[in-house]
Structure formats: C-alpha cells, structure tokens
C-alpha cells in the first residue's frame, strides 16, 4: 500500500510522455495485452496456474528481451545475475512504474482465478548415496558400494569369533569403527576358557594408562611357589577391579561357580574376584585406589617394624579387618594402635577374616607379599566356621 501511494506521487512528477512509453512497453510484454479475452492467459499447457508477476519480473522480462537481442549467446544464468544487480541499483522512483504494473496484474489475476492458492512444488528428497548419478560409470558406483560396505565387514569379522564362544556373548555396539583403542568386551562369562581365548585374540593393544599401571604393581605378585596358573594370571591382567566394595554388595552377591563376576558401573566393565578359597593364596590386584595404597604402606610398615612373627600376624589381621569393616578412607584416618585393638576381640577378628575369605566379597585389600607363615597357617586352617551374622552391624 505504501508503494502504491509512492507510485501515485511519482506519477505526478514524471512527464506524461514518459509514462506513455513505459505503459506501451508493459502492454507489449504483458500477457493480457496479447489476448485479453483469453481466460487462460496465466495457465500453462498442463493446466497449472502461474503466479502473477511482481515488479522485478515485469522489469526483468523487458530487460531480458533487450539483452537477448544484443547478445544471444549469453547464458541465461549470467543474464539473471546481471539483471539482479541492476535492479538493486535502481532508484525507488525508477521502480514505481513497474510496481504499478505488477499491482494491476495481481488484481487481474485475482479476478480471473478467485480460487487460486499458491502451492509450491515439493521437491522429492533423493538420497545421493542410494541412486548414483547417470553420468557416473558403473565401476565407480561399484567401488563406492564396496567402500560403504567396508566398515560392516570389519564389524562382522570382530563378531565372528564371539559367536563361536556362545550365543550370549556379543561385542559392544560402539566398538566397531572406534579406532585402535577399542576394546572388545564380553557381556556374559559363562564359559571361562572360551572367553579367555576370544578376549586375548580380539583385544587390541591396550591404552597407555593400562601399560603404565601394570609395571607399578608387578612387585605385589606372589613368589613362584605360590603363583597361580598362567591362565588365571592373564585374566587378572585384563580385568579391572572396582575401587571400593561395600558390605551390602557382599550380602547380596551369591557365591557362584565362576572365579570372578562382571560388574558394570558407569558404562565400563569391571571384574570382581569370586570364590577364592582359603587354601589358595589371594591373587595380586591389578589396580589400587589411592586410599588403599596408603593402607598398604601403613600395614606393611607396622608389620615390618614389629619384632616377633605373632605380633606381625595380629597387627596385619587387625588392619585387614578394620579396612574391610569400615572402608578404606575411615581405616586410614584412624590410628592403628594397641588401644584400638582392645575394643575388638581376637576371635571376632579371626571370624571376620575367615568369613571374608570364604564370602568372596571381591575386596582389593589382600596383600600376599606381607603374609607371614603363621598367618598363612591360620588362614588355611578349617577350625572356624564362616558366619555372615558377624558382618551385620546394628546402630
């Protein structure tokens, strides 16, 4: 509407002969001028009703015809680019006649096609990967198909050995295509021997942090006489131990036939050791938390400083029972002395330690390097019965 008001003001300022010449050009190029009596002046051959031209279309139609007469070899896209730049450079007073003609065509369009509604064509969404272009050779398309199937084949190779081990075993979905640091982990642990072979075959080179952790705890391995079979030791190097087991998990976890159970926490797979009998020395833990390492140093220093073997065994048993019952953090903060030992009887400590070894709670507070012969005999003996009621504390 503002443009119409400006057009009326501009018409009064423009000379009349100029308006007559412009109107003559509009009428010459306008579809209405060709055949005003034709009701289908804005329809295509297929019956589609075209949109009414705006001011730019009216102007560009005239200018395009002039350019095509001067240079017929110029490309249509180049003509449109030049016309767009020239239209932006025009003054508002120069655009007014074309705006007026566009308004007249719009009103004519509304009168001839009252039920018209603009419905833009919906372009079909074509997938470029699904349909190769017509100009593309079949060799290139076949190569592209092979490249697309490459990652799928790699995943199938990784999953093939896992399918042999058992139906319940499968690789994690994020392992395929994750890079060299990907770890193939099993979800179930029904068959230990098959799991061990498959895991050692499928597991790529471990991360840098795993390599750094293993040499640091190599001194905690038991002597050759007490070492376990090489298969178990290989599985321990692969497994991860949870940082701090609790008493509730000890009471809830049933004692199964497998040596260790899998615990999934925070999206990462861990292993907790199970069914460690009293006659077998406990395995070396692959990873220790900072709090547990402080407890190791405290218990080792107290055990080495005492003179007699019986005192070493008593101190170590008290340290282990205190760490197990109250947690790593509280045990390291409390002073380990004879005054605190008076509150706990030796039989209760022995029962706690014995039930802890039989209950297979998966704790990492087990130090085979610091076990004295007296303590090993006490642990190996069957003179106490394990009772879980000793582990229950009422407040």
Swiss-Prot record:
Biased composition (Polar residues): 1-11
Name of the protein: Transcription factor SOX-11
Keyword Transcription regulation: yes
Stored PROSITE patterns: HMG_BOX_2
UniProt feature, compositional bias: Acidic residues: 187-199
Organism listed in the record: Rattus norvegicus
Assigned GO CC terms: nucleoplasm; nucleus; plasma membrane
Biased composition (Low complexity): 158-174, 289-309
InterPro entries: HMG_box_dom, HMG_box_dom_sf, SOX-12/11/4, SRY-related_HMG-box_TF-like
SUPFAM superfamilies associated with the record: HMG-box
Location in the cell: Nucleus
SMART domains, per the entry: HMG
Region described as Required for transcriptional activation activity and synergistic coactivation of transcriptional activity with POU3F2: spans on this chain: 363-395
PANTHER family the UniProt entry points to: SOX TRANSCRIPTION FACTOR, TRANSCRIPTION FACTOR SOX-11
Region: Disordered, residue numbers: 1-22, 114-258, 276-312
One BP annotation, GO: brain development
Domain of life, per lineage: Eukaryota
Function: Transcription factor that acts as a transcriptional activator. Binds cooperatively with POU3F2/BRN2 or POU3F1/OCT6 to gene promoters, which enhances transcriptional activation. Acts as a transcriptional activator of TEAD2 by binding to its gene promoter and first intron. Plays a redundant role with SOX4 and SOX12 in cell survival of developing tissues such as the neural tube, branchial arches and somites, thereby contributing to organogenesis.
Alphabetized UniProt keyword annotations: Activator, Developmental protein, Differentiation, DNA-binding, Neurogenesis, Nucleus, Transcription, Transcription regulation
DNA-binding positions: 49-117
GO MF annotations, alphabetized: cis-regulatory region sequence-specific DNA binding; DNA binding; DNA-binding transcription activator activity, RNA polymerase II-specific; DNA-binding transcription factor activity; RNA polymerase II cis-regulatory region sequence-specific DNA binding; transcription cis-regulatory region binding
